[in-house]
Amino acid sequence: SSDLRNLAIRGRKIIDKVIRHVEYARSEINAIGDYYAYAKELADGDAVFDFDVTKLSIFTRSLGLAGIEVYDLLRDEYDIQTEFGDIANLLAYVSIGDRPKDVERLVAALAEIRRNYRKDPSKTLKMEYIDPTVACGPQDAFYAEKESLPIAETCGRICSEFVMCYPPGIPILAPGEQITEEILTYIRYAKKKGCQITGPEDMSIQRLNVMTER
């Protein structure tokens, strides 16, 4: 196709243009204040091997807003569709079809969101990852006798189903893991901020399935 031919002939030049747009956006967003657009400094050769410079990932918690809240504001108030937001970050892609004025529009919208919607960052949830406490194997937990309890009564019990927060879609709980107050706080916070909770039988997340105690 003509698109493939164009990429084969001018691919390097096209990607270099995208990278310039993203680097400009990254610099301008960091200059706004309260946002942090991640860059190559994350790549330490250990925990982070490399960094995709074409992705614009922005930390929003210092703004007092979850990434999903900024995502919703961009979509609803500014007609800007980004990739996704979670409880602390926003992800935007800059494509080969984006123009400098598209990048400027995103930067301007983020600056206006900071002016108009900034909140107290001390009220945001600080944890993004919780180390699981594994009490038994997932297969044993999944097929064990179970009961459904109100979520407030599940602390200390062993979960028998998956609970995932989208985005990013990584399990908060898996069968065989112990439910802690920290995990329950995370679930409530993510739900309040507008993240979609998937996996449990009760999609309203009012109840959770846990292993029956013997």
Name these PLM-found stretches:
Residues 6-9:
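Long alpha-helical, hydrophobic tracts
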Residues 196-214:
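Charge-dense polyanion-binding interfaces
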Residues 23-199:
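Conserved C-terminal alpha-helix-loop-beta "cap" of PLP-dependent enzymes
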Residues 11-22, 56:
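Substrate-binding/catalytic subdomain of NAD(P)-dependent oxidoreductase enzymes
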